Amino acid sequence: MKRTFQPSNLVRKRRHGFRSRSATPGGRKVLAARRARGRKKLSA
């Protein structure tokens, strides 16, 4: 059986990166919440 986590930095950035978060209203909400919480890293 193939394992579920097959690491790839490209896919990681595309799916969870800053630009993909900024692209949708929900993603911007996520960034705002993480800023409000004082997270050092906002996205992958």
Swiss-Prot record:
Q: Where is this region: Disordered?
A: 1-44
Q: Name one GO biological process term.
A: translation
One molecular function GO term is:
structural constituent of ribosome
UniProt xrefs under InterPro entries: Ribosomal_bL34, Ribosomal_bL34_CS
List, alphabetically, the GO terms of the cellular component aspect: ribonucleoprotein complex; ribosome
Query: Is Ribonucleoprotein among the key words of this record?
Result: yes
- For the keyword Isomerase, the answer is no
The record's keywords, sorted A to Z, are: Ribonucleoprotein, Ribosomal protein
Basic residues composition bias: residue spans: 31-44
Alphabetized PANTHER family for the sequence: LARGE RIBOSOMAL SUBUNIT PROTEIN BL34M, MITOCHONDRIAL RIBOSOMAL PROTEIN 34 FAMILY MEMBER
* Family according to the record: Belongs to the bacterial ribosomal protein bL34 family.
- Tell me which NCBIfam families the record gives: rpmH_bact (TIGR01030)
What is the name attached to this protein's record? Answer: Large ribosomal subunit protein bL34
Q: Which organism is it from?
A: Rhizorhabdus wittichii (strain DSM 6014 / CCUG 31198 / JCM 15750 / NBRC 105917 / EY 4224 / RW1)
Which lineage do the record's taxonomy fields give for this organism?
Bacteria, Pseudomonadati, Pseudomonadota, Alphaproteobacteria, Sphingomonadales
Q: Which gene encodes it?
A: rpmH
